[in-house]
Amino acid sequence: MLSSFEGEAVRPTSDRAREALFNILAMQTRGARVLDLFCGSGALGLEAYSRGASEVVFNDLSKDSLSILKKNLNALKITTGGEVKVCNYDYVACLDIQRGGFDLILIDPPYRLDCGATALEKIVKKGLLAEDGIVVYEWDKPLELEIEGLERYDERRYGKAYFTFYKATTV
């Protein structure tokens, strides 16, 4: 069982929602390069890794989040380095330093942080998605953003969480 946060200031993705999400993403996860942009406890990125992702980059600005992530990595006997990287940046700085080719980018910011447009535009501008890559944005309401270079192609609701799915548009 993974360590997680206590209290209501932080809202981890429910087990049910996480399982449903990765059942949808089953074909895209095996062998994938994954960026878990607001990783929190790391539950989403760890799920991707457990389902065969070849590389996972975890990022969070919160030192408390990274402390819990590191406990979870240790509990699962996952070492950081080659396949698993841990970053401590704000989301814009993290996106700025990444190289392209992510098959899956998971964006699960605190609900109070309205960063959807900025994050998605930066992903397009930097060319961070692989050709068939997917961005999944989790928020407390549908994310109805139209971003040039991305196609919003699906949305699912699980309890209080909405997952909005984007893929790169072809020219």
Question: Where are the predicted features?
Answer:
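Class I S-adenosyl-L-methionine-dependent methyltransferase catalytic core
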Residues: 1-171
